[in-house]
Amino acid sequence: MKTGILLSLCYDGSNYHGWINQTNAISIQTTLNKAIKKVIKTGQFKTIGASKTDTNVHALDQKVLLIIYFTPILEKFIKAINKALPSDIKILDAKFVDPNFNIREVEYKIYHYYINDHQFDIFTNRYEYFWKHQKIDIIKLQEIFNLFIGEHEFKLFSGLKENEWNQYQTKRTIDDIKVLRINNKVVIQFKASGFIRYQIRIIIANCLNAYLNHKISTTKLVEMLQGIGKKTPFIIDAKGLVLQKIQFNKN
């Protein structure tokens, strides 16, 4: 009997090479699969993640569809898997779903990027980008990020190579971007149904450089959003990026 279980997962991505299985590196999915296999004593199962987070990216609400071939006592089953997992990965919640549940049918994903523009903190440094310049004017920075809200051509703001552009839908819509100040930290919130490889980190790096009037202008950003020109080399560290929430379509 095929059983589907929807897992809500949180993890510190610092020690992992992203979500997806890697041949020669340790990933979140590989580590989760290892823990599940230890509990059920078989390789007859499958995990599918809703978001392919990159190396050093963290998550508070990654969604994972687990397909197994028996019906467990859910609470005990999840407790056993959590016990087998390392301390930097944890299942927060689980529920039975149809095994054919489409985990890619996402209404929206919310990512947060954390910037410390106050005082260096060794205890939070692995979860944020330390800003070495003057305190950020969030109103000024918000005006730059507003250029990216809505439907645009994002191929020049992605990690895709030129020969990959035709393989992906690079014309995308970002529903909202908010620049917030929370507890002496700047939090940049992105909301969209999906993102291209490295898209958020490349957008942030370009906006911060435009904010500093460093090697790029807002005029150039507008042109790039039309697919005009070339990519810049700017990409911000992954460690400040957190997958905050995934919301599925209700129908």
From Swiss-Prot:
Reaction(s) catalysed (UniProt annotation): uridine(38/39/40) in tRNA = pseudouridine(38/39/40) in tRNA
GO BP terms: tRNA pseudouridine synthesis
A GO term for molecular function: RNA binding
Record-linked InterPro entries: PsdUridine_synth_cat_dom_sf, PsdUridine_synth_TruA, PsdUridine_synth_TruA_a/b_dom, PsdUridine_synth_TruA_C, TruA/RsuA/RluB/E/F_N
Top enzyme class: isomerase
Active site: 54 (nucleophile)
EC annotation from Swiss-Prot or TrEMBL: 5.4.99.12
UniProt keyword terms in alphabetical order: Isomerase, tRNA processing
Annotated positions binding substrate: 111
SUPFAM superfamilies in alphabetical order: Pseudouridine synthase (SSF55120)
Top-level taxon of the source organism: Bacteria
Family from the record: Belongs to the tRNA pseudouridine synthase TruA family.
The protein's assembly and partners: Homodimer.
General function of this protein: Formation of pseudouridine at positions 38, 39 and 40 in the anticodon stem and loop of transfer RNAs.
The name this protein goes by in its record: tRNA pseudouridine synthase A
Organism: Mycoplasma mycoides subsp. mycoides SC (strain CCUG 32753 / NCTC 10114 / PG1)
